[in-house]
């Protein structure tokens, strides 16, 4: 934010943030939601704006968007794109790659990624000991599509955090005015023996071990 006494300029602050991240060798992927009522040209214009004006490295597209049109847009050829429904898009050979060479990008150039909850939910089920999950886990670990990469995660911005995952069997959003109706009920979590914050050392140790197991499974999925 702005220093005390200075006028706030969110646009300038965000651009400064992006520059600082890039200077540190980090990339920035923002999340944008479209509800399906926007025209394809409007959606493309929005993505172009963020890429050209703010120099973001990628966009996580949530909701409904014309993915096939977006992929073919030349102004977005170097933008990393994360989305859910790539299986519904006809991808031509090479569309998952950046228009720049490996040397120019200093990386593999892969830019399209599937961002779905399947890995997270199946791995959480396996983590808490649900039966019949071994085959699903093996499929996720071996999964490496030729066209679209897979982004695996054990928690994201929509739902339980990693600590919530080992601390609660059910969501508890009673105090936010939504009467606990907001958020998904399907979190595949396990509280390790007691709901919410505890002081029992055995439960705390088990939760810590489960967190380590979760991060280990995530790491293995990328090897």
Please identify what each model-predicted range represents:
Residues 1-41, 56-92:
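Acidic/aromatic-lined carbohydrate-recognition and catalytic surfaces
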Residues 17, 32, 46, 50-51, ...:
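Domain-wide signal for the mature, well-folded portions of proteins, strongly enriched
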Residues 38-52, 209-216:
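Short, acidic/polar
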Residues 55, 67-223:
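Conserved alpha/beta catalytic core and glycan-binding cleft of carbohydrate-active enzymes
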């Amino acid at each position: 934010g702005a220093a005390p006494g200075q006028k706030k300029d969110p646009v300038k602050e965000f651009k400064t943030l992006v520059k600082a991240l890039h200077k540190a060798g980090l990339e920035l992927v923002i999340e944008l939601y479209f509800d399906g009522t926007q025209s394809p040209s409007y959606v493309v214009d929005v993505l172009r704006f963020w890429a050209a004006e703010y120099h973001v490295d990628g966009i996580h597209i949530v909701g409904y968007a014309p993915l096939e049109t977006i992929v073919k847009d030349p102004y977005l050829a170097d933008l990393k794109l994360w989305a859910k429904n790539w299986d519904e898009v006809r991808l031509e050979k090479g569309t998952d790659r950046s228009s720049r060479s490996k040397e120019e990008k200093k990386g593999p150039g892969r830019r399209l990624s599937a961002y779905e909850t399947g890995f997270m939910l199946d791995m959480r089920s396996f983590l808490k000991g649900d039966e019949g999950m071994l085959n699903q886990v093996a499929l996720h670990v071996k999964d490496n599509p030729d066209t679209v990469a897979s982004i695996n995660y054990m928690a994201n911005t929509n739902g339980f955090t990693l600590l919530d995952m080992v601390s609660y069997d059910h969501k508890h959003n009673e105090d936010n005015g939504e009467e606990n109706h907001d958020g998904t009920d399907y979190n595949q979590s396990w509280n390790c023996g007691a709901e919410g914050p505890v002081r029992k050392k055995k439960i705390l140790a088990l939760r810590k071990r489960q967190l380590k197991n979760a991060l280990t499974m995530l790491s293995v999925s990328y090897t």
